[in-house]
Regions:
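N-terminal intrinsically disordered/low-complexity leader segments
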Residues: 1-16
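Residue-level recognition of specific faces of alpha-helices
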Residues: 24, 36-39, 66, 98, ...
Length: 131
């Protein structure tokens, strides 16, 4: 039997993670998670302001909490430089990069099963170019 560390077993609402699918969705299935992962996969290292400008309609509070969550989940790294003014950059970890094929599959599925107009992200465009 596979067990996950205690930090994954319960969230703020006391919902148990019962299977690998739930774990995966909990890790990268948040509203902004995949958008930030897509952005970092395209541009590799970005500062907070650059992420804020490129992710439409995200508030500072939502961006800050999403970045913290992605760091805690091991999907992104935070690089802080000893400069004035302070310089901080974010980049995908190997674990974060491992999510990209999953997101590509979701893009492909969505494109095949949606009859509306969708604006593809960088990862979706890469998948579309392969076809």
């Amino acid at each position: 039997m596979t067990t996950y560390s205690s930090r994954w077993n319960m969230d703020k609402k006391n919902d148990a993670v019962n299977c690998p699918l739930e774990y995966g969705l909990k890790i990268f299935g948040g509203r902004w998670d995949s958008k930030i992962i897509c952005l970092l996969s395209e541009r590799e290292r970005l500062r907070y302001k650059e992420i804020r400008e490129d992710v439409n309609n995200i508030t500072d509070q939502a961006l800050t909490s999403t970045l913290k969550k992605l760091i805690n989940d091991g999907l992104i790294e935070r690089f802080q430089y000893s400069e004035i003014p302070p310089k901080v950059e974010y980049a995908l970890t190997e674990k974060g990069k491992s999510v990209i094929p999953i997101i590509r599959s979701i893009c492909e599925w969505s494109e095949s099963n949606n009859f509306g107009d969708l604006n593809p992200c960088h990862i979706c465009e890469l998948e579309h170019d392969k076809v």
